[in-house]
Amino acid sequence: MSTRSLVALQVGDHFESIYVHFDGYLKGVGQSLLKYTTYEQVADLLEGGDRSSLDRDSCYGDSDVLRVHRDLDELLAESSVFDYVYVFMDGEWYYVTSNTPLLKLRGAC
């Protein structure tokens, strides 16, 4: 069973994101994302497109095109489709689930 997540980056006034199929929970993808601390690092992560997992250099499907969202509201509207949505903005990681508001991602979740 997979825990689906979306990983997004604020780029100016819009957001770009990729899909991560496995381990989307806080102790999986959430903890892995904490090692990406700069805009450049996150942009490099997203560059490869959708992935099976963050822990392995593996693509998911044939999509290397980033999803583009006009604003945070449009991005968060997709939160019901994914178990977790992770967002890097203003130098910090945040997350949301279908039943939580936008929360700051912290270590040792």
Give the location of each predicted region:
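Short beta-strand scaffold segments in enzyme catalytic cores
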Residues: 4-9
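Short acidic-glycine loop/turn motifs at beta-strand connectors
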Residues: 10-14, 88-91
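A generic secondary-structure signal marking the coil-to-beta-strand transition
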Residues: 15-16, 84
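Short, solvent-exposed aromatic-acidic interface loops
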Residues: 17-28
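Low-complexity intrinsically disordered segments
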Residues: 34-109
